[in-house]
Amino acid sequence: MNITQEEFDAYVDVQMSGVTNMFNVSVVSDYSGLSKEKTIEIMTNYEILNNKYGH
């Protein structure tokens, strides 16, 4: 599954906001606008994506 910079940024925005526990996939999906599948993909590959997109 391909994750874009915009999708990763949406995930990081929720993470930095502190509004929810990041393991609550449903809430993270709602706040970020990402599908649950994409949210899980970002969680699984966070380090790789973080290195790729420079956060």
At which residue positions do the language-model features occur?
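Short, basic interhelical loop/turn and adjoining N-cap
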Residues: 29-41
